[in-house]
């Protein structure tokens, strides 16, 4: 498989890691979905795959929340990260604001640049990370799932807890150790290990400090400017996508991507589509994730929730952003994240299979959609 990676556009062979069975060089076959239209996929999704998910998404009110996984940096000047971007650039997330479109294109094209080398069986050495115990509102207000009813921002905590509980279990089952990442919630601007950033960039993952960053106002922007349906599960998809980048960083997949290469089959697009698939894999297992004491974090996920997440993927495809947000003609040569159809395909591949080995976007002959 490394040879196939080397031959694919925008790739070079990753360093041999030998730690996780689902790393890029060990991926097997890819799952495919009907390709006739987005509407067709939605019908298949609604009618056959998730009929057992009937009630709306429901966070367990009695679940104790681990706020150490979320750092509320609002009003604190941001996380004390590094200065310049250096060789480790932020990996782009789900989408961007209109104001940040140019920044988005620049950062996205650089996605997956120089990353830390090596990931031994014990996991990569942890950099200095922030903590949710910094006195922010989230740490003060969010103790149980029921607290979401009085402070909507608490929602980010069980989502992050659930995502990391799944990946910790998945890594352990494959004989390795998952290194948790802190989600930094900021307002307008922040400092990171990848350099300073503003809300215009959208949610992103910084490989230099192995953390996720998000201004929660992005969720509202998804609805008002991008036209997404929104909702808890759509918001969860955004964060799960960023944690997909964290997984790629930990297992070495990101090192196979050459910086600055764009296009419909480029390394950047393949990386983003795989992160979408990983987000879907988590979503498939969301109702099985638990707190440290074994209580479920998410009790119910509905068909409407799944449809809202898929709708969000549609709204942040490169073709949608270029034509609907940027008012330009679609130019596939500038794709960095994949088309709406591609993003939907890989998100639903993860949702349907629940298997990270099915998230093969790197093989030479894989059908990206």
Where are each of the predicted segments found?
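Post-HExxH zinc-binding segment in Zn-dependent metallohydrolases
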Residues: 52-54, 58-78, 263-294, 309
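Active-site recognition of the HExxH zinc-binding catalytic motif
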Residues: 167, 214, 237-250, 276, ...
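Short helix/loop segments within enzyme catalytic domains
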Residues: 154, 158-160, 164-166, 170-171, ...
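Long amphipathic alpha-helical segments used for membrane anchoring, targeting, substrate engagement
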Residues: 49-141
């Amino acid at each position: 498989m490394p040879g196939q990676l080397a031959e694919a556009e925008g790739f070079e062979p990753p360093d041999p890691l030998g730690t996780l069975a689902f790393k890029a060089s060990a991926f097997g076959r890819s799952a495919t979905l009907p390709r006739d239209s987005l509407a067709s996929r939605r019908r298949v999704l609604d009618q056959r795959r998730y009929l057992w998910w009937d009630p709306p998404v429901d966070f367990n009110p009695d679940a104790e929340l681990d706020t150490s996984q979320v750092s509320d940096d609002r009003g604190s000047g941001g996380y004390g990260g590094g200065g310049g971007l250096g060789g480790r650039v932020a990996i782009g997330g789900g989408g961007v604001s209109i104001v940040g479109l140019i920044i988005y294109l620049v950062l996205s094209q650089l996605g997956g640049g120089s990353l830390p080398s090596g990931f031994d069986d014990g996991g990569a050495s942890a950099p200095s990370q922030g903590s949710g115990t910094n006195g922010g509102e989230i740490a003060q207000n969010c103790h149980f799932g029921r607290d979401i009813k009085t402070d909507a921002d608490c929602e980010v905590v069980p989502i992050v807890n659930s995502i990391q509980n799944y990946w910790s279990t998945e890594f352990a089952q494959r004989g390795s150790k998952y290194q948790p990442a802190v989600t930094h919630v900021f307002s307008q601007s922040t400092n990171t290990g990848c350099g300073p950033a503003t809300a215009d960039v959208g949610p992103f993952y910084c490989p230099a400090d192995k953390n996720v960053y998000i201004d929660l106002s992005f969720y509202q922007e998804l609805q008002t400017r991008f036209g997404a349906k929104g909702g808890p599960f759509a918001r969860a998809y955004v964060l799960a996508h960023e944690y997909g980048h964290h997984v790629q960083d930990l297992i070495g997949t990101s090192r196979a991507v050459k910086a600055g290469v764009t296009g419909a089959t480029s390394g950047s697009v393949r990386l983003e589509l795989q992160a979408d698939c990983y987000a879907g894999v988590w979503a498939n297992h969301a109702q099985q994730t638990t707190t440290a004491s074994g209580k479920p974090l998410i009790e119910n996920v509905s068909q409407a929730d799944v449809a809202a997440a898929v709708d969000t993927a549609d709204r942040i495809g490169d073709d949608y952003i270029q034509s609907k947000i940027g008012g330009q003609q679609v130019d596939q040569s500038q794709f960095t994240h994949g088309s709406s159809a591609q993003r939907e395909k890989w998100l639903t591949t993860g949702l349907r299979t629940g298997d990270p080995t099915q998230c093969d976007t790197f093989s030479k002959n894989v059908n990206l959609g």
